[in-house]
C-alpha cells in the first residue's frame, strides 16, 4: 500500500506540472516551427524580441515574458565569502505578470528593470540571513568574477511541480540589447504569454503571422528555402506530453495498479481461506436472523478496519523511508502530495475498500445455515487457483519488465557513443582566466598516470547548439547543424574519433565535418569527388573566416544521450588554448585512478584557489544523465520484490489449506507406497501447470510494455526470448521452492494421524 500510494502521488505530481499558477490554463509557451529546404522541425526557443512582439502586436495577449540561461555554475559567494548554491536565469520585468507568486520583499518591476539587480527565492534569501536581510546584499557567481549582483527583492519559491523553479532571477537589463531585442537569430530565449480571459489561442495564428510580416523578412527567408512561424502551446501540458515522461507515467501506473491488484487478490485469498473456519460463525448468525445485509455490514466493518490499519502502516513506512522514496521520486515525498493527489488517493482507497468488502461479503453471504450444525466442506479451490493465477502472472510481468529496464540501463551507462570516455575526466573552467590555461595544461600533462590533456568548447554529452550552412556566393541556408565549436588539435585523437578523410582543423579558416554532413550536403551539391578542399559558410562564427575550407571528415559520434540524441550533422573548429573559448578541460588517464584524480584536483585548486573546481569522471556524469532511468528501474524492482513477497504469502496459505483438505488423500497414497518426493511432486506439478499458462500471458504483456519502455532510446536492446525465459525461470523457481517448503510437513507426516478418525 505504501509504495502504491507514493506511485499514485508521483503520477498525480507529474500530471499537475505547471498547473500550480493562478489561471494556469491561460499561460502558453511560444514555440518555433521552421522548415529548411523541406525538412521541418520544431524548437522551444525564440529570438529576444519575439515575446515583446506578442505583447505589442497580438490582440488578446495580456502579458509576455522571456528568460534565458547565462551561467552553468550554481556556485555563488556573498559579501562575507560564504558559498551558496542556486540556479540563476535572466528574466525580464514582466516575469511575475505571467508567473504570479507572492512577493515577500522589494519591487520586482524595479529589480528586474535595473541592470545587475535580481530577485531571489525565499529559500535562497534565508541562506543570506533572512527575507528582509537579503535585500541589498551583493552576490557573485564564480563564472562571472567581479560582476556583483544586488538583491533587489524576494519572492516565494515556486512549488516543485513548476518548470520555473529558479533561485535567482537576474534582470534582463543586465544583458546586451543586441541580444534581447533582435527578431532573427540568437534564438536562445524561452518565451511565455498570458492570454486575456476567454481568448482562444488557436484563433491568434493570423495575428501572429501579421506580427512576423511587420518585423521579419519572411519573403527573403522563403527565397532562401526557409519557412518560419510561431505558435502557442499550453504550458500546462508540455511536461506530460514529453515522450519519456509519458512512458514513465504509463510504467508507474501499471506498477501501481498491479501492486494494488495483487494486494487485493491476496486479501480476498485469505478471506476465502478463512471461510471454512468461519462458516459456523456465519451459520449461527443466520440462525439468529442475520440476513444478507447483516453479513455485508459485518464484512464492511472488517474491511474498513483492515484498510484503516493498512493506511496507518503505510503512512509510518512512508515517514520512515521518506529519504529513500524521495530519491526514487526525484523530489521530497511531501512535495508529491499536491491537491489532486489527495482526491485521487481517496478514490483509490475507496475502490480498495469496496473490493475488499464486497467480494468476501458476497462469498460469505452464500454460506448455508446448515453449516452451523455440520462440517462445511466448501473450499473455493477454483477461486483460490484463479487468484494465484493472476498473482503469478503479475509477478512474471514485473520480473520481465525489471530485466528489460535493467538491461537497457546497463546498455546506456556502458554505451559506445562513437568516442572513448572510459578513462576520461573533465573540469569546467568557465569564469577563470584563460591566459593561465596553457600553463595549467602543461602541468597536468606532467602528472604520472596522465595520458593526454586537451580543451574543448563543451563535451558531447551536453548536447549542442546549432547554426546554419550555406554555400559561398549564395544566401540560401541549406540545413542546420550541431555546432560543436572549438577544440584543441589533439582532441579527436584523445577521444578516439577517427577521420575517414583529411585531418583536424589547424587554423580559423578550416572546419572538420561529420559523415552525416556529407549525407545532407549531397541533397544540394555534388561532392562525390571528396569533401576535403570544398568551401562552405556557417552562421554564428564571426571569429572565423567568412568562407571555411573543409579539411577533414570524421565519423559520426553521438551528441547527447540515448534518450536525448542530436541526430543532426556536426562540425568542429580549431582554437588555441587561451585564445578560443574552450572552458572544458579534458584529461585522459592511463587508468581511472582516484589518487591521480586527487593530484589533478590539487593542481586545479592551486591554479584557481577558492573556486572549488574539480575533475569529474566522464562515466559518472553519464550515469547521472540516466538517473531517471535508474529511478524507474529501482521503482519497478521494488514493486517486483513486494509483489513476489505478497504472492509467496498467498501461495503459502493455499498450500496450507490444500494440505489440510487433502491430508487423507495423501495418507492413502503413502499407505499405497507413495514416497515423500512423489507427494511433493503432486503439489508442485499442480502449481506448475497453473503457472505455465500465467507466465505465457505475462510474457506477451511484458513484450509490448517492454517495447514501450525502449521506445524513447536512440539505441535499444533487442527483446530476446532469453530475457523472458530467464524471468519465467525465476518465477517458476520461487513458486516451486515455496510449494516444496510448505508441503514438507504433509509429505513427511504419519498417515495414521490423518486416518485414525475414519
Predicted features along the sequence, with ranges:
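Membrane-proximal extracellular/periplasmic loop immediately following the first transmembrane helix
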Residues: 7-74, 184-194, 205-207, 229-237, ...
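Mid-to-C-terminal secondary-structure elements
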Residues: 92-105, 118-244, 442, 446-624
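Membrane-helix entry/capping segments
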Residues: 21, 207-258, 276-277, 291-292, ...
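Intracellular coupling helices
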Residues: 263-306, 366-377, 649-690, 748-757
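N-terminal Sec/SRP start-transfer signal
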Residues: 1-3, 300, 365-393
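Small-residue-rich transmembrane alpha-helices
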Residues: 6-9, 213-214, 268, 303-366, ...
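Hydrophobic alpha-helical transmembrane segments of multi-pass inner-membrane transport and secretion
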Residues: 1-13, 245-280, 308, 383-406, ...
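Generic structural signal for small/hydrophobic residues in well-ordered secondary structure
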Residues: 7, 14, 30, 54, ...
Amino acid at each position: 500500500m505504501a509504495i502504491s500510494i507514493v506511485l499514485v502521488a508521483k503520477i498525480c505530481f507529474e500530471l499537475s506540472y505547471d498547473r500550480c499558477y493562478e489561471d494556469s490554463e491561460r499561460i502558453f509557451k511560444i514555440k518555433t516551427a521552421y522548415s529548411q529546404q523541406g525538412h521541418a522541425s520544431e524548437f522551444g526557443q525564440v529570438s529576444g524580441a519575439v515575446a515583446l512582439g506578442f505583447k505589442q502586436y497580438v490582440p488578446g495577449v495580456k502579458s509576455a515574458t522571456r528568460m534565458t540561461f547565462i551561467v552553468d555554475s550554481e556556485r555563488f559567494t556573498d559579501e562575507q565569502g560564504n558559498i551558496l548554491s542556486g540556479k540563476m536565469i535572466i528574466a525580464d520585468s514582466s516575469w511575475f505578470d505571467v508567473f504570479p507568486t507572492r512577493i515577500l520583499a522589494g519591487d520586482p518591476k524595479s529589480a528586474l528593470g535595473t541592470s545587475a539587480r535580481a530577485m531571489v527565492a525565499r529559500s535562497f534569501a534565508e541562506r543570506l540571513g533572512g527575507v528582509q536581510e537579503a535585500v541589498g546584499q551583493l552576490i557573485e557567481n564564480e563564472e562571472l568574477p567581479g560582476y556583483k549582483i544586488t538583491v533587489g527583492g524576494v519572492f516565494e519559491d515556486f512549488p516543485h511541480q513548476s518548470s520555473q523553479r529558479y533561485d535567482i532571477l537576474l534582470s534582463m537589463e543586465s544583458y546586451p540589447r543586441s541580444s534581447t531585442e533582435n527578431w532573427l537569430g540568437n534564438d536562445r530565449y524561452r518565451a511565455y504569454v498570458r492570454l486575456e480571459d476567454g481568448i482562444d489561442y488557436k484563433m491568434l495564428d493570423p495575428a501572429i503571422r501579421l506580427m512576423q510580416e511587420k518585423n521579419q523578412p519572411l519573403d527573403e527567408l522563403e527565397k532562401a528555402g526557409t519557412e518560419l512561424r510561431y505558435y502557442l502551446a499550453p504550458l500546462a501540458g508540455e511536461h506530460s506530453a514529453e515522450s519519456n515522461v509519458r512512458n514513465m507515467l504509463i510504467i508507474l501506473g501499471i506498477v501501481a495498479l498491479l501492486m494494488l491488484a495483487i494486494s487485493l487478490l491476496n486479501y480476498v485469498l485469505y478471506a476465502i481461506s478463512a471461510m471454512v473456519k468461519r462458516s459456523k460463525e456465519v451459520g449461527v448468525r443466520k440462525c439468529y436472523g442475520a440476513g444478507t445485509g447483516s453479513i455485508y455490514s459485518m464484512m464492511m466493518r472488517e474491511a474498513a478496519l483492515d484498510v484503516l490499519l493498512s493506511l496507518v502502516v503505510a503512512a509510518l513506512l512512508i515517514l520512515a523511508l521518506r529519504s529513500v522514496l524521495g530519491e526514487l521520486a526525484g523530489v521530497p515525498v511531501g512535495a508529491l502530495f499536491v491537491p489532486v493527489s489527495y482526491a485521487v488517493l481517496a478514490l483509490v482507497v475507496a475502490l480498495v475498500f469496496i473490493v475488499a468488502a464486497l467480494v468476501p461479503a458476497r462469498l460469505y453471504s452464500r454460506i448455508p445455515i446448515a453449516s452451523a450444525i455440520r462440517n462445511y466442506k466448501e473450499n473455493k479451490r477454483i477461486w483460490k487457483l484463479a487468484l494465484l493465477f493472476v498473482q503469478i502472472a503479475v509477478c512474471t510481468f514485473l520480473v520481465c519488465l525489471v530485466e528489460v529496464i535493467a538491461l537497457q540501463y546497463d546498455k546506456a551507462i556502458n554505451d559506445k557513443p562513437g568516442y572513448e570516455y572510459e578513462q576520461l575526466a573533465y573540469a569546467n573552467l568557465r569564469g577563470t582566466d584563460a591566459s593561465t590555461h596553457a600553463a595549467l595544461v602543461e602541468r597536468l600533462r606532467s602528472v604520472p598516470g596522465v595520458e593526454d590533456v586537451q580543451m574543448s568548447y563543451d563535451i558531447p554529452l551536453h548536447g549542442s547548439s546549432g547554426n546554419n550552412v550555406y554555400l559561398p556566393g549564395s544566401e540560401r541556408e541549406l540545413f542546420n547543424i550541431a555546432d560543436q565549436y572549438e577544440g584543441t588539435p589533439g582532441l579527436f585523437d584523445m577521444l578516439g574519433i577517427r577521420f575517414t578523410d583529411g585531418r583536424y582543423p589547424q587554423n580559423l579558416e578550416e572546419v572538420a565535418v561529420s559523415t552525416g554532413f556529407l549525407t545532407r550536403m549531397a541533397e544540394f551539391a555534388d561532392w562525390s569527388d571528396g569533401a576535403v578542399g570544398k568551401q562552405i559558410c556557417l552562421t554564428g562564427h564571426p571569429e572565423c573566416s567568412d568562407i571555411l575550407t573543409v579539411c577533414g571528415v570524421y565519423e559520426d559520434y553521438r551528441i547527447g544521450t540515448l534518450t536525448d540524441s542530436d541526430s543532426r550533422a556536426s562540425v568542429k573548429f580549431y582554437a588555441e588554448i587561451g585564445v578560443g573559448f574552450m572552458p572544458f578541460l579534458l584529461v585522459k588517464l592511463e587508468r581511472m585512478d582516484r589518487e591521480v584524480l586527487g593530484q589533478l584536483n590539487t593542481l586545479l585548486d592551486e591554479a584557481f584557489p577558492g573556486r572549488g573546481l574539480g575533475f569529474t569522471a566522464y562515466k559518472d556524469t553519464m550515469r547521472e544523465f540516466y538517473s531517471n532511468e535508474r529511478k524507474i528501474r529501482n521503482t519497478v524492482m521494488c514493486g517486483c520484490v513486494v509483489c513476489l513477497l505478497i504472492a509467496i504469502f498467498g501461495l503459502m496459505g493455499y498450500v496450507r489449506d490444500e494440505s489440510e483438505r487433502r491430508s487423507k488423500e495423501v495418507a492413502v497414497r503413502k499407505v499405497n507406497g507413495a514416497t515423500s518426493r512423489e507427494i511433493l511432486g503432486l503439489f508442485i506439478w499442480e502449481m506448475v501447470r497453473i503457472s505455465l499458462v500465467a507466465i505465457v500471458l505475462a510474457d506477451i504483456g511484458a513484450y509490448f510494455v517492454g517495447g514501450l519502455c525502449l521506445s524513447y532510446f536512440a539505441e535499444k536492446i533487442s527483446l530476446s526470448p532469453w530475457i523472458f525465459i530467464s524471468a519465467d525461470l525465476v518465477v517458476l523457481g520461487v513458486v516451486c521452492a515455496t510449494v516444496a517448503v510448505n508441503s514438507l510437513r504433509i509429505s513427511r507426516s504419519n498417515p495414521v494421524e490423518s486416518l485414525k478418525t475414519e
